[in-house]
From Swiss-Prot:
This is Homeobox protein engrailed-like ceh-16. Disruption phenotype: Embryonic lethality due to embryos with disorganized epidermal cells, which cause morphological and elongation defects. The seam cells in these embryos abnormally fuse to the syncytial hypodermis during embryonic elongation and ectopically express eff-1. RNAi-mediated knockdown results in embryonic lethality and embryos exhibit seam cell differentiation defects as indicated by a decrease in expression of early seam cell proteins including elt-5, nhr-73 and nhr-74. One of its GO terms (biological process) is positive regulation of transcription by RNA polymerase II. It is found in: Nucleus; Cytoplasm.
């Protein structure tokens, strides 16, 4: 018996699946029916056996939507010492005027458009990435400072869920429930 919402029912195809034809070496790729052929001419049996939603994905095919990887920097030896260090760009030291202007812009809008970022970079004599990173850091700092979790409750390494008051209350509630249930089943 197949239940209306059972696994067998969900996974079963609502349409009868045609039996795939397997091409023999004598069969050329052009003679394969379009239902079973992929764009490169090879048999595509899977696409005929499963509904179309199986092959859909929530990820975009655009190259910019994929994972971002930082470019690795080459290490150079430092002469006689023989040790190698990674070159790092020095930290940007913003002038007071630049900081005032960045703070003013941040109060107006926490997010900049690309055009506004370009204009601001030109006006302040900075590059766009410096402005972008300043805004990212400022948003992160604001989020951290306005967090609802009190600072003294946070662990410096990892949070301990056993120290949370709602969990202790939950344990007490479950213990009380167990007592009530135990009394209900006593003869």
């Amino acid at each position: 018996m197949i239940l209306k919402f059972g696994i067998e029912r969900i996974l079963s195809s609502p349409y009868p699946c045609p039996s795939p034809t397997i091409s023999t070496p004598a069969t050329s790729p052009s003679s394969i029916s379009p239902t079973f052929a992929s764009p490169n001419g090879t048999p595509n049996i899977a696409s005929s056996m499963y509904p179309a939603w199986v092959f859909s994905t929530r990820y975009s095919d655009r190259p910019s939507a994929g994972p971002r990887h930082r470019k690795s920097r080459k290490r150079e030896s430092t002469g006689s010492s023989g040790s190698s260090e990674e070159e790092k760009r020095p930290r940007t030291a913003f002038t007071g005027d630049q900081l005032d202007r960045l703070k003013t812009e941040f109060r107006e809008s926490r997010y900049l458009t690309e055009k506004r970022r370009q204009e601001l970079a030109h006006e302040l004599g900075l590059n766009e990435s410096q402005i972008k990173i300043w805004f990212q850091n400022k948003r992160a700092k604001l989020k951290k400072s306005t967090s609802s979790v009190p600072r003294d409750r946070c662990s410096s390494v990892t949070p301990n869920p056993h120290n949370h008051p709602s969990i202790h209350g939950g344990y007490q509630l479950m213990a009380q429930l167990a007592k009530v249930q135990a009394r209900a089943y006593m003869p």
